[in-house]
Amino acid sequence: GNRIVKVGKSLKSNSATVIDLSDKTVLPGLIDGHTHICLTPDYSSNPPVLYKTNTYRTMEAFKAAKRILNAGFTTIRDVDNEGADMADIAVRDAINEGMFVGPRIFVSGWAISITGGHMNLTGLRPSIDKKVEQLAIIADNSEDMVAAIRDQRKSGVDFIKIYATGTLRHINRETLEPLSQLSTEEVQIMVNEARRWDMDVAAHAYGGTGALHA
């Protein structure tokens, strides 16, 4: 099972499998509150959305989940699928259905960003820019933001991920603070919609006004 029922000496159960760990040190399962099972080492130089199929990326995510479990983490919060479509959802569901052993996973699916923001691929020729798959859902107005959250809920995510700022590459050159990608009103719109569906919202925020808005 997944629940500790009793702790003590001389406990007996007719149905339990007994494992002698008297010479071992036993720890409770660890929890990783922010990880990315779809993120691979080659990500920064070659965005996998451009050359890897989502099927292949799902297999990579399976491998990552197994490695995480072997490291002692029995629960993880996967924050953004890195443009791998429903790979994180597939891995979570396969584990929950007993298809293979892995950690308990809570997933956000696609993150939500803006045009020109973090996870929106830049530097592409205008003729192909709109045709290339992105690393996140790009939403520039309240209608698109609400629709994105509803689509994510329909897909079966556990919570919503938004990009309130970019990375340290997107900073104010005078204050060195991360640039805010979303207004307070935009953040509130998405939080309100997520709450309607009983979902939490995780915000990528390196600091500055973006973090305050979140």
Feature locations, PLM:
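Histidine-rich, glycine-flanked metal-binding segment
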Residues: 1-27
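Metal-associated gating/positioning segment near the N- to mid-region
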Residues: 24-99, 115, 185, 213-214
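Hydrophobic faces of well-ordered beta-strands that scaffold small-molecule active sites
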Residues: 29-35, 76-78, 105-109, 160-162, ...
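Short, ordered loop/turn segments at secondary-structure junctions
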Residues: 42, 81, 110, 165, ...
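Metal-cofactor-binding active-site regions of metalloenzymes
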Residues: 42-50, 99-134
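Active-site mouth loops of central-metabolism enzymes
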Residues: 46-59, 122-147, 179, 200-206
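Short, well-ordered coil/turn segments that N-cap beta-strands
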Residues: 73-75, 99-104, 157-158, 195-199
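Histidine/acidic residue-rich metal-binding segments in metalloenzymes
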Residues: 90, 142-214
